[in-house]
Amino acid sequence: MSLFDLKLKDVHTKLHEKEISVSDLVDEAYKRIEQVDGQVEAFLALNEEKARAYAKELDAALDRSEARGLLFGIPIGVKDNIVTKNLRTTCSSRILGNFDPIYDATVVHKLREAQAVTIGKLNMDEFAMGSSTENSAFQKTKNPWNLEYVPGGSSGGSAAAVAAGEVPFTLGSDTGGSIRQPAAYCGVVGLKPTYGRVSRYGLVAFASSLDQIGPITRNVEDNAYLLQAISGHDPMDSTSANLDVPDYLSALTGDIKGLKIAVPKEYLGEGVKEEVKQSVLDALKVLEGLGATWEEVSLPHSKYALATYYLLASSEASANLARFDGVRYGFRSDNADNLLDMYKQTRAEGFGDEVKRRIMLGTFALSSGYYDAYYKKAQQVRTLIKQDFEKVFEQYDVIIGPTTPTPAFKIGEKTDDPLTMYANDILTIPVNLAGVPAISVPCGFDNGLPLGLQIIGKHFDEGSVYRVAHAFEQATDYHTKRPTL
């Protein structure tokens, strides 16, 4: 049994009872990475020398009884769009292939303060644009459950690393489902917090009004510990909410008697595979058995979410990615004759096809003559989608449905059809547009591939999301299943 199969509090106990050391945990991470990452390809860069040195420091602190907090000594992986001081951060893009940040993102700083150990940086779709991690400029991450299948995206490396037992925790980012979808495909737990709950300072921006950093773990309890550690107001992020962070662990009571669940008919409609629907209905039976009730509801504007998202996210991306021009940092083309040519060549050679596609789509949507017809209208529809959620939450505690319409698909199956690829996020995108929190927890299998249950909560009510997710998890054994690598 791996140390990473244990819950965080059990690892914490073993550390303090001197049954294991921090160096043992770090050794376990790098040993497992050496064993399986040649197949899975989750990590882009390793922090081995510094991590081992830091582990020795923490072991000395443990001997002096100076260990603080439950994350003390725990190995963690970080998605490669979250900046890490002096540890290469590329966003899986050639244009940032040589970028070494000079500061830590706020979430990385918080984990350092909690004395967690950064093991390395994780692969992703380039600039978080994708649903399969096939858009990385460097490598294609595989699904640990079946190496011929994708792990999801854009946080595919983050989910695959946890599923493969390389690290117990990772950080991902979620703009339209990029934590929840790979968590579902890889059979792990992934939470997108409420927009503003976690600081975005140091997250390389894709779509600033949608991006949110969140935790990926093997179980709900550990997920709550990690969110507790990274949440809170940050003066460096103007969109960070100045609200107290509740004690998420106190929500994990297992008691959901009287809880009212809404199930949107749109989330079990056309395009959702029959096995996926059945897994959700089976999960609802489990929750009914625990004392909750559910009713079918409608989120009528969900059908417009995909188009709305791709207009808004691409528009924001076209502005955010303008900063990558070859002047200040990252890749610079050698084939230019003048400054303007250098801008063009750098971006043409540095960005991948999907990133270029979205920049062009966003630039078009923002252009004179099209702004009102596309961007402005999309913002209006976003408001309607948010109001749909608010209306349902007036009567219900949580919304439940599948995380994805299908299980993971084969590598290469959808790369030639961007619209089919985009449709993988049809059930997760509305949550980002509304800014509410949502989690994916394992709820079944289809031909050996994991399925995810999505639990959506009210603004800043991650506690209720965790309460339901934990109750379901404790009543089932899906979270205990491991891929054989």
UniProtKB/Swiss-Prot annotation:
Spans traversing the lipid bilayer: none
A GO BP entry: translation
Keyword Ligase: yes
Active site: K79, S154, S178
GO cellular-component term (any): glutamyl-tRNA(Gln) amidotransferase complex
Catalytic activity: L-glutamyl-tRNA(Gln) + L-glutamine + ATP + H2O = L-glutaminyl-tRNA(Gln) + L-glutamate + ADP + phosphate + H(+)
Regions annotated as coiled coil: none
The entry's keywords: ATP-binding, Ligase, Nucleotide-binding, Protein biosynthesis
One Pfam family linked to the record: Amidase
A Gene Ontology molecular function term of the record: glutaminyl-tRNA synthase (glutamine-hydrolyzing) activity
Self-association and partners: Heterotrimer of A, B and C subunits.
Listed NCBIfam families: gatA
UniProt family annotation: Belongs to the amidase family. GatA subfamily.
Function text: Allows the formation of correctly charged Gln-tRNA(Gln) through the transamidation of misacylated Glu-tRNA(Gln) in organisms which lack glutaminyl-tRNA synthetase. The reaction takes place in the presence of glutamine and ATP through an activated gamma-phospho-Glu-tRNA(Gln).
Protein's name in the database: Glutamyl-tRNA(Gln) amidotransferase subunit A
Gene: gatA
